[in-house]
Amino acid sequence: MGRQLLLLLGMLAMGAGAVQAQPSQAIGETETCRSVANETLQSLQTRKAGLEQELKRLGERPTPTVRKVQEDILDVVFQMECLNVAQPTNLKRSVAKRSVGPGGGGAPKELVEVTTYYATNRNKTGSLEPVKLYGGNYEGNFHYGRAVVSIPKTHKPGEVEKPNPLMRLIFEPDPSKHFVLKSVEPLDMDVARKEMAQKLNAPGSAKAILVFVHGYNSGFNDAAMRAAQITYDLNFQGMPFFYSWPSAARIRAYLPDEESARLSESIFENLIEDLTTKLPVTDIYIVAHSMGTRVVSHALQHRAEKGKPNTQLRELLLAAPDINAELFRGVIAPKLTAMQGLRTTVYASSSDLALMASKVVHGYQRVGETTSGVFTYPGIETIDASSASSSSRALGHSYVVDTPSVIGDIKSIVLNHATAKQRGLTSSGAVPNVYWKFP
């Protein structure tokens, strides 16, 4: 189980964690990637198919032999990803395409700045550097703050442009080419509420909030930059906001992150209560990714069970949800669909290698993974994004935030409240198990 879990950690880290994570960021992956030097994608696919047949022959009873075959399957899947993104030739191309010089002095002309507010229950480290201000330890209450992220004018939708990891050890990011977390300022609760209220009441404001919730292996700075990227790419005219729960931002911290996510459910529930009762907001849109979907889904489930009225939550977008599909179907989905005024959209894919690995480790299908069938539930729109995602990019796990066609789909939801049919998606399946695909 230890080896199997470690492989899952590496895969989820590369696909769901740090912004534009590179293989060199994932400690412990190097030896596995070196082992594919004499392999081809075809040979690995053949091995994987043979192992899957063996697993089918053995059945689902949890024996040591079954577990060994499961581990071997994970090993092969991870090696396939190594061929896609971790070979030295690919790394060299990445280095060649990025700036290797130090950031220029003075204020660069070719950038835009996005100011986003946040809530977090991470511990403060005592550091004054924006990227080191918060750690990965859990605190029992959340507090507010404000972050400023600069985005280069050369930005491409779906990207969070950063220096190559090797160069990052030597040079600072160049603001004319890279995302930069310029400032992070914790705010007193009353001060934050007043400032956010002024923002929402400003002339031309949509009085709307876009809330982003990150997944496993994400640091505070990763969440800030991803929230800024989504806001910018969607051309969202309301107030950007993100919630950063205390992910340890380490590959080997999958199990601790699961515990932190579970503990943070009540924190996010309290946050939603604060946003809806203390601010002049009319519409709230939530985009949650991977393990972050657990935090959000359970928090809203608890609100529904307590009979909390819903007058401001409009759209809930669950991106590649790493949630037990049976738990979601039996416990969470009934509560979400009962919340009047809230529409829930699930994005799933058959190319999500990270969730395939999670399914093997947990023993249950994940809501965001479709190789065993597309999750459907009456009142929830499920989008099979397999045709718009690729396992060769971030393990096929970040397509919702890094694929222009999917970002465009989200934009239609948030800005126009368009249904899947109105967005031009193609229906599949029969009632009541209808889902949608990209054309």
Put a short name on every predicted segment.
Residues 7-15:
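Bacterial N-terminal signal peptides
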Residues 24-45:
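Short, charge/polar-rich alpha-helical segments
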Residues 54-67:
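Charged, low-complexity interaction regions
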Residues 218-223:
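Short substrate-entry loop that stabilizes the transition state in hydrolases
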Residues 268, 288, 292, 296:
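Gly/Ala-rich beta-loop-alpha elbow adjacent to hydrolase catalytic centers
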